[in-house]
Design a protein with these regions (language model features):
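Class I SAM-dependent methyltransferase "Motif I" SAM/SAH-binding loop
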Residues: 89-91
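A short acidic, Gly/Pro-enriched loop at the edge of an enzyme's catalytic core
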Residues: 142-151
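SAM-dependent methyltransferase
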Residues: 185-246, 258, 262-263
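Core SAM-dependent methyltransferase catalytic element
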Residues: 270-289
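Class I SAM-dependent methyltransferase SAM/SAH-binding core
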Residues: 93-139
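A short glycine-rich, Lys/Arg-flanked "PGG" loop and its adjoining helix->strand segment in the class I
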Residues: 168-180
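A short SAM/SAH-binding and catalytic strip from SAM-dependent methyltransferases
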Residues: 150-165
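Conserved class I S-adenosyl-L-methionine
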Residues: 2, 6, 13-80, 278
Length: 289
């Protein structure tokens, strides 16, 4: 759902209700949903972000590669859409549409009502209209246990959740919702690629030092201007951190696919220092039987 700058139960889903378009609002911290930073809240409420989203990401190299790896990693769907996949942080439905076309019963979850409206106006919008849930990824109690076969969380959406405890709570929810043996496909950006140039290396070091002094800051946290928002939040991972978080949340990590610095291909020579060379990772994890 986000790219940093360069250098109810699923069986009882209700149709997405239309709401009047409104400007983004600035909420005080005590009114923010759990795990949602102020800039992220504005992102989810801004009509302008949703309306231009598809065009904005169209030239991003990661677009296309992540969908291909997702469809290659998931087992083939059963006939008559009997294989249910949750797209967590579905945005305007980029992955939802691809999974629907591949024969999956695709359900989308997102906190942004404007983004969810965008799903209904795109390809397969009518089919997907009743398969959309507005929810905070950290608070997925609205979804019953063992009701999805697989799940995905692409485009560094998990990095938009503020706080490691909250990110792990999200992963724990997904492990509860996905049936035993099901897959989770998740993308994260790699914080350790920052060493490639001097400004990024300085930011990497500053983040490390700040994490030792400030309990509210975690190594890899970034706050930056993004499409008119002054303080967009994103947490970037290390290879070891995403592995540990998945395991601690009830997942078995089957593979961590390192991506090239621009995200446009799998990292060439992937076996050589992927933790430092990769621009990000796509993790393939399975819920134990």
């Amino acid at each position: 759902m986000n790219q940093p700058p360069p250098k109810a139960a699923p069986d009882s889903l209700q149709p997405l209700s239309a709401t009047s378009a409104g400007r983004s609002e600035r909420r005080p911290a005590w009114r923010l949903p759990t795990g949602v930073a102020p800039g992220t809240w504005e992102y989810t409420q801004a009509e302008s972000i949703a309306k231009g989203y598809r065009e904005f990401i169209a030239s991003t190299p990661l677009v296309g590669l992540d969908i291909r790896l997702l469809l290659e990693s998931l087992p083939a769907p059963k006939p008559q859409r009997q294989t249910r996949v949750l797209d967590l942080g579905c945005g305007d439905g980029r992955a939802l549409r691809a999974m629907w076309e591949a024969g999956f019963d695709a359900l989308g979850v997102d906190l942004s009502q404007p983004m969810l409206r965008g799903v209904t106006t795109g390809d397969h919008g009518e089919a997907l209209r009743n398969r959309l849930i507005r929810a905070n990824l950290v608070e997925l109690d609205c979804l019953r246990s063992d009701t999805a076969d697989h799940a995905c969380c692409l485009f560094s959406t998990i990095g938009m959740v503020r706080g490691r405890d909250c990110r792990r709570r999200f992963l724990q929810h997904v492990a509860r919702i996905v049936r035993p043996g099901g897959m989770l496909v998740v993308h994260v950006h790699n914080r350790n690629r920052w060493w490639r140039d001097r400004p990024s290396a300085r930011a990497w070091l500053n983040s490390l030092v700040r994490s030792l002094r400030d309990r509210e800051h975690e190594w890899g946290d970034r706050v930056y201007a993004y499409r008119g928002l002054a303080d967009m939040y994103l947490h970037t991972y290390s290879r070891n951190e995403i592995r540990k978080d998945l395991i601690a949340s009830g997942w078995q990590v089957e593979r961590l696919i390192p991506l090239a610095a621009d995200g446009g291909q799998v990292l060439p020579g992937a076996g050589w220092l992927p933790g430092w060379r990769a621009g990000g990772f796509i993790a393939l994890a399975r819920r134990p039987q």
